[in-house]
């Protein structure tokens, strides 16, 4: 019975696609115009390739539930960076869950033709959050079918957008200026602030490493899945990016519902069977995103709590199956509070972009959690050279430093341009300040909780 629930290689590859490929992040990137193609290719080479190799080495050398927390903690055991990374990694999840919950009422409006009031919106958002939370109470191997279906749907949606873009161009031509200069990298604040979304679109390989106990042969399956899944993901991103960029005027792309807008503009319909089917499939992928990430995030938080680096509630496990329900419940509560605040903000300021505000805040916190992984990789090579490494990043010391520090620098730069307002005009401040203030509050709360937990753990 247990053997039947083990992941096959195909399951692991589809899990990589389900975790890493994020359909809802395509629209913000497409909004920067044709320069997105330069950034996609550049980030594939400068970030995806080294990050994928480093994750493969660390994930196959140090298997277990701890994920990136375990790697950082092993590399720097006397510092708080493991605890900080686990906090940043965890807090990103309820923020992300809230940002996706905000999209659900709009998708249901497309499906049903109904317009929801604020109370109905809140109920829909809470239903999404607590459905995901309930599913997180069970092992990820019990959700193989959901993950596989979600991965398949994501690929279908991306290919559909790409094909529709080609059809639109054949019939009507390109809607955006396709001059060579438009493909050069944009260095304006608008473009640079979305680079973090491209990096986010490549994150998540370490989540699959926390599935090791559910795999038949993790030391072989993890690197195989990361390589094959990474190639598929890169190709799908480029194809779907072309579809959106070719058929939709850049200024008309919505950050909140870009995929649905893309299909509507390409087909010339805002409703109907086809658009409704796309909305339904997109909704299913949102559940797939949350379910696939919940295992990695909750396991990492529980592992850190058991080591005394996170609040004790995160260490609570369900006696029935040993799942980290404390972390899952806390995520559900925090996401619910964020959605309630979002409803209040929407009532006070109807034009606010809640999805992007919540999504950008989660981006900052998630990227912060990854920054220490790269120096941890170098440190573990130095202090633990004798551990068996089923997959080993090729190259000498100099090359390894380049492979580690370039993606780390890209992460830090993208955090800066996402969270720090570089202009004091009212429009810039209204867009950036919620992200800046939210990031500072999240960091400060984390420091307080980590310090309090450390005192209790050592007393």
Each predicted region: which residue ranges?
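Helix-loop-helix junctions that connect adjacent transmembrane segments
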Residues: 3, 35-38, 115, 120, ...
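Select transmembrane alpha-helical segments in multipass membrane proteins
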Residues: 5-16, 38, 78-92, 124-128, ...
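Hydrophobic transmembrane alpha-helices that form the core helical bundles
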Residues: 30-31, 50-129, 134-137, 283-300, ...
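A generic transmembrane alpha-helix motif of multi-pass inner-membrane proteins
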Residues: 40, 168-169, 357, 361-369, ...
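TM-loop-TM module centered on a large, flexible mid-protein loop between adjacent transmembrane helices
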Residues: 70-78, 110-114, 225-291, 310-362
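Membrane-interface loop-to-helix entry segments
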Residues: 119-172, 203, 226-230, 363-372, ...
């Amino acid at each position: 019975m247990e053997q039947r629930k083990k992941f096959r290689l195909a399951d692991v590859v589809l899990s990589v696609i389900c975790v890493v490929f994020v359909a809802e992040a395509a629209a913000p990137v497409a909004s920067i115009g044709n320069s997105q193609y330069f950034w996609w290719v550049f980030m594939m080479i400068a970030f995806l390739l080294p990050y994928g190799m480093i994750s493969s080495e660390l994930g196959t050398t140090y298997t277990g539930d701890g994920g990136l927390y375990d790697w950082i903690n092993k590399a720097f055991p006397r510092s708080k960076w493991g605890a900080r990374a686990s906090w940043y990694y965890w807090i990103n999840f309820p923020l992300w869950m809230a940002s996706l919950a905000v999209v659900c009422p709009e998708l249901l409006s497309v499906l049903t033709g109904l317009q929801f009031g604020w109370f109905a919106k809140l109920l829909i958002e809470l239903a999404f959050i607590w459905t995901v939370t309930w599913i997180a109470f069970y092992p990820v191997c019990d959700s193989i079918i959901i993950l596989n279906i979600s991965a398949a749907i994501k690929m279908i949606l991306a290919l559909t957008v790409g094909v529709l873009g080609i059809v639109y161009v054949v019939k009507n031509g390109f809607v955006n200026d396709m001059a060579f200069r438009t493909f050069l990298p944009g260095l304006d604040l608008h473009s640079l602030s979305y680079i973090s979304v491209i990096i986010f679109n490549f994150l998540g390989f370490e989540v699959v490493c926390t599935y090791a106990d559910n795999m038949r042969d993790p030391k072989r399956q993890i690197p195989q899945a990361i390589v094959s899944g990474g190639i598929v993901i890169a190709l799908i991103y480029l194809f779907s990016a072309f579809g959106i960029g070719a058929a939709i005027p850049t200024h008309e792309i919505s950050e909140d519902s870009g995929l649905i807008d893309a299909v509507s503009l390409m087909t010339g319909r805002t409703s109907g069977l086809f658009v409704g089917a796309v909305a339904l499939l997109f909704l299913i992928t949102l559940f797939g995103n949350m379910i696939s990430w919940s295992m990695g995030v909750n396991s990492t938080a529980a592992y850190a709590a058991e080591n005394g680096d996170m609040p004790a509630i995160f260490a609570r496990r369900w006696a029935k199956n040993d799942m980290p329900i404390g972390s899952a419940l806390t995520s559900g509560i925090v996401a619910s509070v964020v959605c309630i605040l979002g409803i209040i903000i929407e009532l006070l300021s109807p034009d606010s972009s809640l999805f992007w505000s919540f999504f950008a805040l989660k981006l900052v916190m998630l990227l912060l959690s990854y920054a220490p992984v790269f120096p941890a990789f170098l440190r573990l090579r130095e202090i633990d050279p004798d551990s068996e490494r089923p997959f080993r990043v090729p190259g000498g010391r100099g090359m390894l430093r380049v492979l580690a520090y370039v993606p780390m620098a890209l992460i830090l730069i993208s955090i800066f341009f996402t969270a720090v307002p570089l202009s004091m005009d009212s429009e810039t401040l209204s867009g950036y300040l919620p992200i800046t203030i939210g990031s500072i509050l999240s960091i400060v709360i984390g420091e307080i909780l980590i310090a309090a937990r450390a005192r209790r753990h050592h007393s």
